[in-house]
């Protein structure tokens, strides 16, 4: 609840303009009357039905424009309601100072939660790193094997290429056969590594769920959704990576087969293929496959970093003074920023509702 309160105060201070804040405090002072009334309202909040309260909030927050408009200055809307303090400006200033003091006291707890969640997510990244390292090692190893298995340079090979049309054509047809055979074998060898990566993601993300639960500011339901979403996204990305590796191998097979077929056709027309050129072409195609696959694995690693950083912001937002505190919200008049803010407000509502519900149950259980 501490982090939830701090996040609420942070949203107010970070996203409302000075005029909007003034309107909010005018509205607060006009509707509060006196401290006893505020206390009664707070006590009543514990007995409100969550559904009706959420419906009311959603009606007020139907879009961000209306929300900010409602927080605008209310002093020009007609008669002054009863119970208005004699010095609303002074009351507003006092409330702002008190809230700033409360936020300053709560921010260390929020920073600690952000750090604890970050450490756990960093642990997830460390646990998944061996899978990607192993995958890159396998790519390098299989490329080296293919290069050895598809060699066409040697004294016997040169003699065969120069021995006549039939000999050269036979050698290139044999190369085609070896290309299909060995690339197919490599494709099969990559399946277990892809399966291990997917299994590892599921297992380590579940471990993350258990380790991050004590530190997350989010409600238990939202925590479960965030973790499940992270697991699903990483699993889909791992499966997509495996599909791209298979696609790369299929493309390599087609390119090498087409090259060998073209060489065999040239041999039938009387051209003598150059063994050195054939070997260089095979090597270049294999290195291109290795390079492209390494880039795709690196992209997958960056995706893990990006997804875990997003989860950290969702589960334990940093304090307002932190450099990572909602930088995307600082763009004025941005529809994307407003949409993200609306989503954050929905998350905040769920966390507050969950906390109030828990507090209400504990209050009822007291003797």
Swiss-Prot record:
Domain of life: Eukaryota
Compartments (UniProt record): Secreted; Early endosome; Late endosome; Golgi apparatus, trans-Golgi network
Stored Pfam families: Apolipoprotein
Matching InterPro entries: ApoA_E, Apolipoprotein_A1/A4/E
GO biological process: acylglycerol homeostasis; cholesterol efflux; cholesterol metabolic process; lipoprotein metabolic process; phospholipid efflux
Function: Minor apolipoprotein mainly associated with HDL and to a lesser extent with VLDL. May also be associated with chylomicrons. Important determinant of plasma triglyceride (TG) levels by both being a potent stimulator of apo-CII lipoprotein lipase (LPL) TG hydrolysis and an inhibitor of the hepatic VLDL-TG production rate (without affecting the VLDL-apoB production rate). Activates poorly lecithin:cholesterol acyltransferase (LCAT) and does not enhance efflux of cholesterol from macrophages. Binds heparin.
Quaternary structure annotation from Swiss-Prot or TrEMBL: Interacts with GPIHBP1. Interacts with SORL1; this interaction leads to APOA5 internalization and sorting either to lysosomes and degradation, or to the trans-Golgi network.
Family to which this protein belongs: Belongs to the apolipoprotein A1/A4/E family.
Stated name of the protein: Apolipoprotein A-V
Gene name, Swiss-Prot/TrEMBL: APOA5
